[in-house]
Amino acid sequence: MSAIPDRAGYALVTGGGARLGAAMVRRLAADGWAVAIHYHHSATHAEALAQEIKSGGGRAVTLDGDLGALGSFADLFGRANAGWGFCSLLVNSASAFEYDDIATVSRATLQKLFAVNLHAPVLLARDFAAQLREGSKGLIVNVLDQKVFNLNPDFLSYTLTKTALEAATRLLAQAMAPSVRVCGIAPGLTLRSGEQTAEGFAAAHASTPLGFGSQPEDIAEALVFLAKVPSITGTTIVVDGGQHLQPRTRDVMFTYGIAPDAPVGKTGK
């Protein structure tokens, strides 16, 4: 029996209004999926993206929600289910990203990042299974980071959350089979973050073993690939130009474009 997600359902992409999430939304829509675009801070981008898809003949809706504070994740599905029936593809792309290290880590930062980057994907997986139509197959894809395979202590809380989510990907794949497959995609340096300069980003992007890093479109293609290959579950595809093969004692942005002692602000990933 095929484990390809039921195309009678729709795809929900958290953090789908901007950055990597938007690239995945566009690719899914181009592949014929009806897409629910979740956002929190990117309302203007999400609404424009939905209109772009609908203008091209596709189906899209937007869903607002703070994944760090939502009392019921089932409501997120319920709002889209009212028009489309059920969700058969969940992409956990939303991510909180903030610099800290062992000297600056705090309980507040840990709680905030774990709420969005781990608690939300796991609870969304639970509610995804509950609303999946009986007899249908589903797919959950967690967006991770090549850092989980190439550890360094920068962005300490963020790295801990993504490492935990990689483990959760394998655990959920065991727990949710055979009706739901669970996979991960681990991008490398794909978009500028924080205080990194354009020149520094370009240099870092070119420093991988392949001579180039990942593009948003590469991540989106990996997602479509996972949706179409029914025998893949419990594993993570690293899409990074080989960045994870280059051990570093500090995050790559401190090698290219940011002084080691420069302050690094909050940003999206």
List the model feature ranges, each with a label.
Residues 93-99, 242:
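Conserved NAD(P)H cofactor-binding loop of Rossmann-fold oxidoreductase domains
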Residues 101-102, 109-114, 204:
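Substrate-binding pocket helix/loop in short-chain dehydrogenase/reductase
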